[in-house]
Structure formats: structure tokens, C-alpha cells
Design a protein with these regions (language model features):
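Conserved alpha-helical scaffold segments that buttress catalytic/binding sites
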Residues: 2-269
Length: 269
């Protein structure tokens, strides 16, 4: 298996002021020994600049140009890791860093996305519940839905095809409907929190892997996005919106990761 290489992405460009602090996550995780635990190389840090708490009047998105400028820089850092034959581990930051990681992969071929998150993050800007913060819309932008400045970075819309995405363990369907979120595309596979519980963690993980590795699917591999808010608030308070009824860490980690680790040995270069 390739060696892990950690890229720090301490960006809060996709967050509202009330949720600032996520940009400290990389240093906190490294201080806690993550690099040693993974025997990982530290492959650099991509700083974000230009944060503003104001919503752009044209796009209804916060910091759209800053996110558009940051994403290629992060993509370059991820590409450098891949060029070394290593396995990139990108530490955010808020969920808008997804645009940089998926941009790195879109430059190389057709990649899928396993989106493990308590929320589907698919809001259109005009109904975004976080004052246009991209962290509530990043999956929509990555699949090409939204203003060009964030949804067509480098003219590569979409960064990932809808039919190459699995949204795993989300539990926000009622909130999305109540707030008028655009519907998730029918060709995007959703394995929500209730399905994970009904199928069991191992079977749900196998379902996700089977879909992403199908013959007509993304031939070059897939990215795993993990937002800590997928976990229950009793075990994960260090998120902007701790909520009950999420995944339990031990059950999830032992059963799901074992399924996904098998595909980590694929050649992503």
C-alpha cells in the first residue's frame, strides 16, 4: 500500500463567522499524533487568504473568488503527493476544500467520491441556510451545480459526475426538504444513516464500494471525504453543529474502514 502523506488545508473560506475554528483542525490533529499513527509524511500546508463574512451579492455565496483561487493551490499540493506515488490525506478546514481535492483528481481522469457526512451539502446558494457558506453547498458545486466561479473551476465542470458519487450516512433529509434544498440527483447513490443501520455497517460499506467500483463507474478510483459531524454528538463535539443520532465510532471504524481499505491499494497515479 502507498505511504500516507498529509496535506494541511486550514481553510475556513466556506464557513460563517460563528463556525470559525475549523481552520485549526489540522494542527490539532497533528498535535494529537495523527501523522505518527499513520506513519505519514508531512507534505505541506496550503494557507487560505481573503476571508470575508459578507455574502457576495452576485452569486449569493460567501468568499466565492477566494474559494476559486484556493482550490487550484490545494489541487497542486494533492497532485504533488500523487506524483510521488503516495496516498494523500487532506486535513481541513471546512468542507469547501472538497473542490480542491476533486480538482486534483479531475485533472488526472475520472474519479468517484464517497461522501461521508451528516449532511448532503447540496443547497443552492439562494436557499443556503448558512448565509451562502460553501460548506453547505460543496457537493452541489463539485457536481457542477452553482455559479461558475465555484462550480466550473478551471473550466472542468463537473469535478465529479453525479453518478460517480455515494452520499453515505447523511441524516438531514427532513432539513433539506423543509429549507427548500434542491433534490439530490436520481443518479447519485444515497446510503443514508437509516440504511446504514438497517443494512449493518459492513453491508452498507460494501454497497458503497460495489457501486464506486462497478464496471461502468469511475475507472481511476475514488476520493473519501469524511466530515466528523457524521458521528453522534456524544462522541464528537468538535464540529460546528453537534447533533444526536449519528454513527457510533467503534462500530463504524471497525466495519466500514475494513471494506474501504481494500480499494486504497489501487494505483491513483
Amino acid at each position: 500500500m502507498p505511504r500516507y502523506a498529509i496535506v494541511e488545508a486550514p481553510s475556513a473560506l466556506g464557513h460563517v463567522p460563528e463556525h470559525l475554528g475549523v481552520e485549526r483542525a489540522p494542527e490539532v490533529l497533528l498535535e494529537a499524533g495523527l501523522a505518527d499513527g499513520l506513519a505519514a509524511r508531512l507534505a505541506g500546508r496550503v494557507e487560505a487568504a481573503g476571508y470575508s463574512a459578507e455574502r457576495d451579492p452576485g452569486t449569493k455565496v460567501m468568499n466565492p473568488q477566494a474559494i476559486s483561487d484556493y482550490s487550484p493551490l490545494l489541487a497542486n499540493a494533492v497532485a504533488a503527493v500523487l506524483d510521488e506515488g503516495e496516498f494523500p490525506v487532506v486535513l481541513g478546514g471546512d468542507c469547501s476544500i472538497l473542490l480542491g481535492t476533486m480538482l486534483a483528481l479531475k485533472r488526472r481522469g475520472r474519479y468517484g467520491l464517497l461522501y461521508i457526512d451528516g449532511d448532503a451539502d447540496f443547497y443552492q446558494p439562494e436557499v443556503n441556510p448558512l448565509n451562502g457558506a460553501a460548506s453547505a453547498s460543496d457537493l452541489a458545486f463539485a457536481t457542477g451545480r452553482g455559479p461558475d466561479v465555484v462550480a466550473d473551476i478551471e473550466g472542468r465542470r463537473p469535478l465529479v459526475r453525479s453518478d460517480d458519487v455515494v452520499v453515505f450516512a447523511c441524516r438531514d433529509a427532513a432539513d433539506r426538504e423543509r429549507r427548500g434544498c434542491q433534490p439530490l440527483p436520481p443518479d447519485l447513490l444515497v446510503v443514508d444513516r437509516d440504511q446504514v443501520r438497517r443494512l449493518g455497517a459492513s453491508a452498507a460499506a460494501r454497497e458503497a464500494v460495489k457501486y464506486l467500483t462497478r464496471d461502468e463507474g469511475p475507472a481511476d478510483g475514488f476520493w473519501i471525504h469524511l466530515d466528523a459531524d457524521v458521528f453522534d454528538e456524544t462522541i464528537m463535539q468538535a464540529v460546528d453543529d453537534p447533533r444526536p443520532d449519528g454513527l457510533a465510532w467503534m462500530r463504524w471504524s471497525r466495519r466500514c474502514v475494513s471494506q474501504w481499505a481494500r480499494v486504497a491499494q489501487r494505483d491513483y497515479r
